[in-house]
Amino acid sequence: MKIQIFRNLWVLQIAFLLLAPLGLQAQKKEISAAKDLVKAGKDLAKAESSMRKLLTDSANRKNRKIWSILFDAVKKQYEQGNEKLYLKQAYDTAQLFNSTRQLFVIAQGLDSVEMIPNKKGKCEFDFRKPHSEYLNRIRPNLYNGGTWFIRKQKYKEAYQFFDQYIACSTAPMFQSYKYAQKDKYLSSAAYWAVYAGYKMQDTKATLHHSYEALKDTAHYNYMLQYLAETYKLEKDTARYLSTLKEGFERDPKFPFFFPRLVEFYSQENQLDSALAVADKALAIAPDNDIYLFTKGTILLNMGDFKQCIEVSKKALAVNDSLAGAYYNIGLAYFNQAVEMDKNSQQSRKTHQEIDGLYNSAMPYLQKYRTMAPDMQDQWALPLYTIYLNLNMGKEFDEIDKLLNQKKK
C-alpha cells in the first residue's frame, strides 16, 4: 500500500515537472504575441486584456515585461484616441480620459516593482525616467478628465481622476518634478476631489484631500460648507459647530452658515447664542429682511414679545411678503394676551388690555393665514381663541368647523 502511494506521488511530481515548462512556454508565447500586437498597433485592447489577465496571477506581479507591455498597449490606445480627436474624428472621450488615468496606475504599479531591491540590494529603474517624462507631459489630462466627469455628474469617476492627479505629488517616480511645491493647480484639484466626495456623500473621500483643498482660497467658503455637512453626516457635533462658526466669522453674508448656526443654537436651546449670531449679522447688514425675521423669531422663542414685535415690523418694512414675520407679530400679541388671561382675578382695565392684544394679533394672524393656508396647525388655534374671546360668532363657527374636520 505504501509503495503504491509513493508511486502515485512520484507520477504526479513527474507530471508537474513536465507540465510546468509547457505553462511557461505558453505564457512566453502570450507575452510575445501581445508585444507584436502593440508593435503593429492592432488589437490593442486584446493585448491589454491579455497582460491584465497574466497580472492577476500573483506569480507574475513582479514581471516587468508584462507591466511594460501593458503600459505600451494602453499608451498606444491613448495616442490613437488623441489623434482621432485632433483630426476631429469620432472617438469615445470618456475612454480617452480613462486611458490617461490607467497609464498612471500602470506606470506606478511597474515603478513599485522596480523599487524592490535585487539580490545585490540595489534597485534597477529601467522605466521610471521614460515613463515619468511621458506622464508629466500628459498629467494635465488627469485634471481635465476630472472636470469633464464633474460636468457629466459622474462623481465617482471624477474623484478617481483628481485623486490620481494629487497622488502624483507624493509618488516616488515623480519626485524630481516637485509637484507639491510647484503645481499651482494642486489645491484646486483637491477642492474638486472634495466636491466629488461630497456629492457622493462619501465622508472618507470628502475629507481625504480637505487639508490641501483649504489652500484653495477661491473656494474656501464652499470648502467649509462641504466639511460642515460631512461632519454632520458623521455626527461630529463639535467639528460641525466649529466649522459653522469659522465660516460665519469669515464671511457672515455667505448664505450657508448663518441659518445653520442659528438653527443649531436654537435646537440646543442656546437662544442667547442664537441671538448673538443674529445681532452680529445685523451689525453688518441692518436692513437685511432675513436677519431681521430671524431675530424676531428668536425673540419670540425667548418670550421677549415686545422686542419681537418691534424687530418683526422692521422686517416687514423692508419686505412685506415675509409670511413668517406676520406670524411672529401676531403670535407675540396673542401670547401676551394669553399670559394676562391666565390670571383669574381680572380688573375691567386688564380685560380691556387683553381684548386689545387679541385685536392687535388678529390682522397679522389673518394675513398669515392668507399667505400660508397650508400651515393650519400654526394659525387655526390662535384665531379660534381670538374669535372666541372677542365674541366673533361667524368667524368662530368657520374656524370651529375647520378644526372639527381635521379631527375626523
Language model segments and positions:
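Short coil/linker segments at helix-helix boundaries
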Residues: 73-152, 168-187, 334-364
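Start-of-domain marker
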Residues: 27-93
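Structural register within alpha-helical repeat arrays
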Residues: 33, 70, 77, 138, ...
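Canonical positions in the second alpha-helix
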Residues: 54, 165, 212-213, 246-247, ...
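Structural marker of alpha-solenoid helical repeat scaffolds
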Residues: 57, 168, 216, 250, ...
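Residue-level recognition of tetratricopeptide repeat
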Residues: 60-63, 172, 186, 219-220, ...
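TPR alpha-solenoid repeat register
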Residues: 66, 174-178, 189, 222-223, ...
